[in-house]
Structure formats: C-alpha cells, structure tokens
Amino acid sequence: MSELLSFALFLASVLIYAWKAGRNTWWFAATLTVLGLFVVLNITLFASDYFTGDGINDAVLYTLTNSLTGAGVSKYILPGIGIVLGLAAVFGALGWILRRRRHHPHHFGYSLLALLLALGSVDASPAFRQITELVKSQSRDGDPDFTAYYKEPSKTIPDPKLNLVYIYGESLERTYFDNEVFPDLTPELGALKNEGLDFSHTQQLPGTDYTIAGMVASQCGIPLFAPFEGNASASVSSFFPQNICLGDILKNSGYQNYFVQGANLRFAGKDVFLKSHGFDHLYGSEELKSVVADPHYRNDWGFYDDTVLDEAWKKFEELSRSGQRFSLFTLTVDTHHPDGFISRTCNRKKYDFDGKPNQSFSAVSCSQENIATFINKIKASPWFKDTVIVVSSDHLAMNNTAWKYLNKQDRNNLFFVIRGDKPQQETLAVKRNTMDNGATVLDILGGDNYLGLGRSSLSGQSMSEIFLNIKEKTLAWKPDIIRLWKFPKEMKEFTIDQQKNMIAFSGSHFRLPLLLRVSDKRVEPLPESEYSAPLRFQLADFAPRDNFVWVDRCYKMAQLWAPELALSTDWCVSQGQLGGQQIVQHVDKAIWKGKTAFKDTVIDMARYKGNVDTLKIVDNDIRYKADSFIFNVAGAPEEVKQFSGISRPESWGRWSNAQLGDEVKIEYKHPLPKKFDLVITAKAYGNNASRPIPVRVGNEEQALVLGNEVTTTTLHFDNPTDADTLVIVPPEPVSTNEGNILGHSPRKLGIGMVEIKVVEREG
C-alpha cells in the first residue's frame, strides 16, 4: 500500500510542477532534488533487493560504505551498469519534464504544493522507512526488556544419551521443497524431511541472514550484531566471549565437538567462533587437502559437497566406533549463490525450470541428493538409534538464478529433525525463527528449552510468536546484543605480537591488519576481510578530525607518510588524524608496545584532501623508488608506466594470471637500454616448469626456463629499436584456486615473479 501511495504522490508532484508551477530556478532545483531522492531511494531498494532478497538491511548499509568484493561479483557488473545508466536516463527525463513550461510565469502555490507532494512521496516510500529504521538501530541505546527475554541455559545436559549430527545446507531454504511449485527438485531429502519433525515456518530475522550469522543464531540464540561487519569477524580473537552457546553446553556435558566444511575455516571467523564455543576439532579446506582422495577436485569456495560429506561420514563412523559422546556439525557449499556448483558424483546434475536449464536449481537438486545419501548411511548404520540428525539452512538463498522464482513464494528457512532413538513424523507449523534451532536441539538432547533469545519449538514459545513485529524488535535489541561482545571503550596502550600477528589493548585481542577509529568513549575496530575494502580505503572514509590507529604492512602507508619504508613488508603503526598530524612507527621487536598520542591540532583541509586522494590510489597505480620491480609489495617502480597480466601481491611475490592477460607486459616510461641484462627471480607453476618461457623485448626473444622453486636467471638483451616494453609469455597457464581469495573465480597461473631488474651493460 505504501508503495502505491508513494508513487501516486511522486506522480502528482511531477504533473503539478510540470504543468502549473512555471519558471523559477530555486523551486525547480528543490523539486528536482527531492524527486531525484525518491528515484535514488527506490533504485537503491531495487538494487538491494536484487542482492539480498531482503531490501535495505545491515549488509547493504555496510556495502554502501565499503567496496563490493567477493564471490561472483563479476556476475553483477552488467546489472550495476544498467542501474547507473537507468538512473542517469531517469534524471534527464525528469529534468526535461519539469522544465516543459519554463517560459510561463512562476506560481508560488503550485510550486509549494509540488514540493510538499515530493517530500510526501519520499516519506511514504518503503526505502526511506527501511533506511530510517536502520539508522535508528545504529543509534539506539537498546531496549529495556532485553534482559527479560535473553535467558542463559544451564551449562550442562544432566544425562546426555544421544549423539548429534547437525547439517547446515548452504542457502537450502524450505521453499525449494514445495513439490507443487518445484516438481521433483528435492525428492531424496524431501522424503527424509517428511519422515521427521518438520518445522515449516522458520523465518529469517535481521542479523541471521548470512552463513556465520545463521550459525551464531542457531547455536547461541542471538543475531550476529557486532561493532564491525559480520563477515569481517575473522579478525577477532574471541566471539561473544561471555555467551553460553550450544557447543559450550555439549562440551561441558562430555561431548567431543567436530565441525567439517569444504571452505577455508578462517572465512568470516568460523574458526574463531567455533573455538570460542566448545569445538576442538575443526576441518576446512586446509585441513582436508591432505586427507581427501582428490585434493584438486574443488570449486571456487573449496571442496565439493560429495567430498565433504564423505569425510563427514568417515568421521561419524570413527567417532561412533569409539563409543565416546560426540556432536558432528557440517556445512555444505555447492548451493552458494550466484550459480552454485554440481558435484561430479550426484545423479541429479540438471534441472529445468520455466522451460530452460537453471544452474541454481540444478545445484540444489544435486546437493540435496548428496545430503540424503549421507543421512541414509547414518540411518542404515547400527549407531542410528543413538543419534539425532538435524538438517537446516544457514539462511535464505541470496540472489541466484532461482531467486525470482523463490520470491513468488512464502519463503522460510529449513529445519527438520530425525530422531534415531524415537522416530517422530510430524509437520509443525508454529511460528519460529533461526534463533530457536539451538534451543530445540538442546531440549531434544535433554537440556533446557531456552538458549539466549531462542526457545524450543517443542515446549516453549518463540519470540516470533510473542512479538508480531519481531523484525523491528530484533533491531531494537541490537545495541544490547553488541554490548555482549564486551568491547573496550578506550585505547591508551597497546601491544603487537609479531609471531602471532595480533594486537592487544584494554583486554581485547585482534588479528592484524587492523584499523581503529578511537573516540572519547568508543573504540571501533575495522578489520580487513574478503568482503571488505582494504584498510586504506576504509581510512579514506574517515572525517578530518577522526582519531585513527592503523596497523598494517609498512609499504601500504609508506606512500603517505614514510617513503623510506616503501619496500618494507614489516608491520608498521600509523596514528593521528587525516586532517591533522600523522606518525608512522616501524614495529621492530617481536613484542612491541605502543601508546596512542592524538594531538588536538588545527585541521588542514588541503592536507586532508591530499591524504584521502593518496589513500584511494588503486594498487596498480602506486609507484615507489627502487632499481627493480619488487613483486611482494603493491605498485611498481617509478620507471614503470603500466603493467598487465599480473595478479595481486602475496607475501613472496606475484603470479602471472592469464585471466587478466595472456602475457605479462611491463611498459616503461622510457626506452630500455641499448644493451642490458634482465635479472629475473621467479618460479614456474605446474606444467610451466622446465619449459621454455618466451621473454621478448622489441624484436628480440630469449627463452627463460624455471623450476617449481624460486631461482634467479640472467638474460642478455640487445635493444637497437629502443623498445620500452618487456613481454613474458607463460606457455601453459593453469586454472587453479590455489592461493586464491575464497569465493573468487580461479586464476590461471603461469610464473611466480619475485623480482625483475634491468641492468644496463657498458658498450
């Protein structure tokens, strides 16, 4: 209803101004600005809904102030360009319509009416309401009834008798299981769901809408609200340290807790969360690569579901035979947006919908088959009678190729339980949410029927039943939940541990690198993650007078304030204000102690603008003083004009990447010497080893031969044509996820470059 009212007010404003208001520059500018704001808000809502499926939420608020990086971003470039072009076209058309009667006399009454209608259209728009609610949630002090509803359970289960297998299906929401809408999409897992306790109305709340947030909600009974973006939680050393979560209770009750997934455990701080709450045995892509049958059988995120669930079955067998009490949690990945992945062992590799193949539906059909196979193995084993199996989605599906079909349905998360000790077949339509999952499992295992804000759906009343406005209520509790982190409110002294790559202050510990905004009564940590902007880009968003402490590799801040450290990969500490004074200190001891020293100086806006502009320089445009190209730092020597075909810096150097260019090209500002030696320190990847690698300067070509280990080779070149470009052509680039950023498309690696130096020869 509000959408129609908002649009009607917008249309009325446009028509009244265009046909009645007449000519006046000020009224035209004011009306166009407000109407333009309406357009921007609604396009933002449309774009946000495209990515999140939930309108403008916390994730969008974070993304709007940081870079959009991570898995599948290239899939959204065209829609993004379309939105920008559409916005420009709408603004142009709007301006043209409003000025149609610019030659008529100005009418104050109609101009005022048009402006008021435009303001009303903005106020009535769902986008404005969502943003207003988000802003309020950032500034609230909390809700006084939080302590009445947040309940800590007993730390132990009195007499535990059952083992637990808990399967998180990535984005595997219950909507997929509607056989009338999606025929024969989930037959195997759907049949198992119908054999157990099926909870059909599990809604998604704010702070539970991505993987680590869904895990926290289901195990701790609280949404993941933090003083930083949730997926950046890999930088903290402990996770809700004061809270009692399901894993803590299981461990205290004698359970050995295991977690198995195909992706890297460090992503989004899953390792930190699980270790903080009772899990001592964790297996991710790094831990599994020496165990699995085929370590090269991987997708963009890690190992395929069939591999992961095979390892989970082996672990279930091993633990069951040992006779010890255990819980085994596992997380799939093949159904990750935007397209999903198809395991090679499943029979259901293709699913057509709406008359054409659909990759996301195909991935769902394949993954559910793999999960069902795993469950059926457990059911057929002699240990099933002592086991409770839980299957749940971590969150609703995000924007994938099935998303527009899902949105036509009443969407709910998946949660069902199969009991080996006491078979129960029932569909329970009680209103509930993800936070109730842990409490329900705890109740089944013989513990309390509450956990944080979660309540057992078998013997308690969910917050979703108590509060009709549960989404708004959850946001009202956000400050209370953030306070559970027990974050420090001041930073005066700090310690950096180079061996552990950690910084400690006021009782808290964080992984490096780290950026901190320090005010009188608040310390705001801004970690770096796969989905956040680099810290220097985040620092560029600081106000001129904001106090900051920035701990990072020296070369990243050297271009601003310490050019002598431009090639150093050691840790450095910078602090100050972007519009005032800044200092850079080299961390030169294993345990380095520092103090904050913020001076109340006069703000220089020219200095501020210069600092911001420098911070925003992209890596490939950075230049440093050096007589060689050093590949383990960002940028290039001052003599280099541009380069291509080279991946990002890593601790040892950089790989060539044929996804960015078939050849490595380094173009210098001036012609290379007439005679010179090219000293190359490098290694080869895969089949590029021990093969001639063409290296060209102008018309001359030399062959470079490298092994899999780093070596230094000198090639002799004559350059009679004054060529200014060096070209290296890896013969067989290999597509691989080795060393890749989690969730990014595979790189095509050829050679790994450590240093390239041009040495002029006499004569």
Swiss-Prot record:
CDD domains: LTA_synthase (cd16015). One of its GO terms (molecular function) is phosphatidylglycerol-membrane-oligosaccharide glycerophosphotransferase activity. Its main location: membrane. It catalyses: a phosphatidylglycerol + a membrane-derived-oligosaccharide D-glucose = a 1,2-diacyl-sn-glycerol + a membrane-derived-oligosaccharide 6-(glycerophospho)-D-glucose. Pfam families: DUF7024, Sulfatase. Its EC number is 2.7.8.20. It comes from the Bacteria. Disulfide bonds: none annotated. It is found in: Cell inner membrane. Keywords: Cell inner membrane, Cell membrane, Membrane, Transferase, Transmembrane, Transmembrane helix. The chain crosses the membrane at residues 1-21, 26-46, 77-97, 108-128. GO terms for cellular component: plasma membrane. It is a multi-pass membrane protein. Pathway: Glycan metabolism; osmoregulated periplasmic glucan (OPG) biosynthesis. One of its GO terms (biological process) is glucan biosynthetic process. Belongs to the OpgB family. Transfers a phosphoglycerol residue from phosphatidylglycerol to the membrane-bound nascent glucan backbones. This is Phosphoglycerol transferase I. It comes from Escherichia coli O6:K15:H31 (strain 536 / UPEC).
